[in-house]
């Protein structure tokens, strides 16, 4: 995973300094140990003539195009800049389409396709993306900042708006570095957490911070933010199908889904519990891989709670390079670190 953060606001006492942006970016260093980059632009104005400061920070975990694809990245003429956390599975198809329309790519990464897609489609571009993502785009042509989150919200994205300024980040840790962000605990959020074991969007544990909902994008311009849905789940089916058709369709969809997620310039692995879900995914991945898949399972020293024997059976059947890890009672010593991350 990677991490993104940043801010947009009037270039006054509320501007983000390079030092503050670095602290916001370093707060999520665990999300991206491979690279850290920041960018600040101050030669922008809003519709009322106010000077704007745009700050972007990025922590990278390299998966595709290890040497290139550094962020924040810009389009050909530097009028659009972006930070992006996630992976776009259909980037190959998108790239070929965009190159056919004359776009020039500077990297081989999946994220650059978002930039050029946005140039052509604006906020409608998110409908074309197949993947998991949290995106921040500065559009200097329109003097606006756009946030977007993938369809089911696999990648997190938090934001706050105060004093005509937008602050955003992959985690609350980045926003907490900004002193005037309201971090007062929301009692309603505590009630929701105790009821559901999580805080439903758009709320968070803090009164002054919101989560961008899955399948939504937000546009921040002239000190105001508007949120819109770009995708929703359609539970209907076009026509009734037979059980054997449903079985084959599920097989095709699952195989295609796993295949898309195996695009990588680094070694891949599979978390294998021995249950139906992880066993199916590992089996499909093994069928798509030219070399044995690496699989991992987590066990416990108490037999009643340990299911790694099932994982070992599946691993042996599939011929994976399997490794078992055991959680010991001493693991409680790192509980604070686990909660923090």
Q: Model-found features: residue ranges?
A:
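ATP-dependent adenylate-handling active sites, centered on carboxylate activation for C-N bond formation
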Residues: 1, 7-20, 40-48, 100, ...
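A short catalytic or substrate-binding loop motif that flags glycine-/basic-rich loops and adjacent residues
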Residues: 30-31, 48, 55, 63-65, ...
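An anion-binding catalytic pocket shared by soluble metabolic enzymes
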Residues: 64, 69-72
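Glycine/alanine-rich phosphate-binding loops at beta-alpha junctions
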Residues: 28, 34-39, 56
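Catalytic core of PPM/PP2C metal-dependent serine/threonine phosphatase domains
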Residues: 108-142
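N-terminal segments that mediate ammonia production and transfer
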Residues: 3, 11-15, 19-30, 75-76, ...
